[in-house]
Amino acid sequence: MKRLLLATAVSLLTATTAMAQTVYIVRHAEKVDDSADAALSEAGQARARALADALRDAHPVLVLTSPLQRTVQTAAQTAEYHSAPSETVSLEGGGAAHIAAVAARVRALPEDAVVLIVGHSNTVPDIARALGYEAAADMPECEYDRMTRLTVDGGAVQAVISRYGAPSDC
């Protein structure tokens, strides 16, 4: 009986201390043109479907995007699949203000939350850095297939970089 109680106590302690946020950060998928608020191209729509497929077991509780339609469209299928609310984070005040607001929103979530962030090539690395992943590499304009998964446990951050969808033409 003592062993059972000890095993139960250890199990509860492990479950309590194993809570960590999981943050997936991707760039929006391919766009139709270089206009300021371009929609997704056919390749981008395929990548958005691939993102939803790649995250089918992730169960995000929140999806964060910029207000530009290419980020919203990239995130839509994943948010819909998981019935996760999608919030846009303003670009007013510039990139630094946007990055700070995204990081603050993530930090306000429960410590065991799973969140998807869809950003831009010039914000994705800085968002990762703002969340504690100092080694985040800059993202070339031609790269669309990088997914950064951060596990944030208190002050400790672990990162896993993976690829999804068709390989980027870089």
Task: Give the residues covered by each predicted segment.
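Positively charged n-region of N-terminal signal peptides that target proteins for export
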Residues: 1-4
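Bacterial N-terminal signal peptides
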Residues: 7-15
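Active-site-proximal alpha-helix that buttresses catalytic centers in soluble enzyme cores
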Residues: 20-112, 124-130, 135-170
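Conserved beta-strand position immediately N-terminal to the Walker
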Residues: 115
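Short beta-strand segments
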Residues: 118-120
